[in-house]
Amino acid sequence: MNGAVLIADVVATSAAITATRSRKAKVAAIADLLARADPRRSGADELETVTAYVGGALRQRRTGLGWRGLTKLPAPAPGPTLSVLEVHEAFERIAAPAGAGSQAARAAAVADLFGRATAEEQQWLRGVVTGEVRQGALDSLVQEGLAAAAGVPLPEVRRAAMLAGSTVAVAAAAFEGVAALGAVGLQVGRPVLPMLASSAPDLAAALARAGGDEVAVDTKLDGIRIQVHRSGPDVVVATRSLEDITARLPEVVEVARALPADSFVLDGEALALAEDGRPRPFQETAARTAMGAGVEVTPYFFDVLHLDGADLLDVSAAERAAVLERLVPAEHRVPRVVTADLGVAEEFLAGALRSGHEGVVVKSLAAPYEAGRRGASWVKVKPVHTLDLVVLAVEWGSGRRQGWLSNIHLGARDPATGGLVMLGKTFKGMTDEVLAWQTERFLELETSRSAHVVHVRPEQVVEIAFDGVQRSTRYPGGVALRFARVLRYRDDKPVAEIDTVDTVRSFLG
């Protein structure tokens, strides 16, 4: 059944968003498009599809398509006729084939879809498949547009999306009103977006944000973020990107089932330890959670979001900590000290570093659990300054690096526009093993190339160490990193969680 909104409408909105740097104009364009998909007229399916598409994403997690499969397309249609629902149904058919004959079936479905699309629509469809739709419509902008279109408060939309795990999941509820959004609550077994920490250059700066009040200082473990849900015997273990990894971590499931409660939601880290109790290299923990085989991991928890029918998101961190202490034994809690004294905090940080950990996270004791938000309530402090950035492009190496992709172009999020801002390049910190891996990885993400540069889909997150930040007119963000070097690639982190250019600017002297 054809929907009222055409894919041409999405393409036009995408172009309008790309053409302006004004956040207000971007939000207005998104709101206008979403209003045309009002579910009270055309149903929730169309609205959810439009919401996903204006954010530059498909509703299917995987389609089996890559940019190489889109190099030979049929001639474009002379005029726009495709609805968003027809495109969604086409991608359902494209994603479905498996087994013998699946490639031919997928190719036929692709040819049928693209043959019905205009030249502009073909370009947009190719971009959304390959991740090139960079109109700056990040999720926060889509949420603002949804709130405006539905006439509901933005905080209500944000909260519901965080608890449901996506904006698409609550789009229809927004048009039903505040009561429907308020009915979206934490559901045991359905992961929520995790609370995130901002950065500070040192402990003094982190404690200053608390205004002299006592804070919790947690050890920052160098593991994989996990969220553990239990309802009776049923346990779900999810990553920070909400991927279900329960089957890969039976030892975490065992710990969860042993806790003295019927239902709960815990936030924490999974960490692989050496025989002396020190953390193993991060790559070993990451490999274990990704593949389900390898070294054993131990869960450590630092927060509780729900216990036996009671949601705890809105209670203070101090109250949640008391609940956590009653529920989880000390050997599975992240080490913590509560203090307002800088000397005590610095001594605790030194002890964490001696034990092989990354640093500390300073947490307000009065704050609620702000799912999906990065704010001043949690502040991480590490002796080595690091940023999580995204790779925008890579340059071919020379000399002994001939034939390898070497110099990576680094980008941060611009919260003002929703786009990505380049901060500089680096080829430092790369072993031969890393060079070989990233060459293969970035060729998989390639979208185009020039003589020396391979442009890639902005999907790969990299953790960068740096010595400082300086003002620069060379890059659009007005800042550049000094002595940037690769610490590691972070396959566990989605691009939505990379650092902002504002965070980078906070490190200016």
From Swiss-Prot:
Q: What class of enzyme is it?
A: ligase
Which InterPro entries would you find in this protein's record? ATP-dep_DNA_ligase, DNA_ligae_ATP-dep_bac/arc, DNA_ligase_ATP-dep, DNA_ligase_ATP-dep_C, DNA_ligase_ATP-dep_cent, DNA_ligase_ATP-dep_CS, DNA_ligase_ATP-dep_N, DNA_ligase_N_sf
Thylakoid as a keyword of this entry, yes or no, is no
Superkingdom of this entry's organism?
Bacteria
Q: Which terms does the record give in the GO molecular function aspect? A: ATP binding; DNA binding; DNA ligase (ATP) activity; metal ion binding
Pfam families assigned to the protein according to its UniProt record, in alphabetical order: DNA_ligase_A_C, DNA_ligase_A_M, DNA_ligase_A_N
Membrane-spanning residues where?
Answer: none
Which Enzyme Commission number(s) are listed? Answer: 6.5.1.1
Q: Name one GO biological process term.
A: DNA repair
This protein's record includes keyword Transmembrane: no
Q: Which reaction does it catalyse?
A: ATP + (deoxyribonucleotide)n-3'-hydroxyl + 5'-phospho-(deoxyribonucleotide)m = (deoxyribonucleotide)n+m + AMP + diphosphate
Q: Where is the active site?
A: K220
Amino acids binding ATP: D218, R225, R240, E269, F302, R374, K380
CDD domains per UniProt: Adenylation_DNA_ligase_Arch_LigB, OBF_DNA_ligase_Arch_LigB
CC cofactor:
Mg(2+)
| Keyword terms, alphabetized | ATP-binding, Cell cycle, Cell division, DNA damage, DNA recombination, DNA repair, DNA replication, Ligase, Magnesium, Metal-binding, Nucleotide-binding
Show the HAMAP family listed in the entry.
Answer: DNA_ligase (MF_00407)
The job of this chain, per UniProt, is described as: DNA ligase that seals nicks in double-stranded DNA during DNA replication, DNA recombination and DNA repair.
**Which family is annotated?**
Belongs to the ATP-dependent DNA ligase family.
What name does this protein carry?
Probable DNA ligase
Q: Which organism is it from?
A: Nocardioides sp. (strain ATCC BAA-499 / JS614)
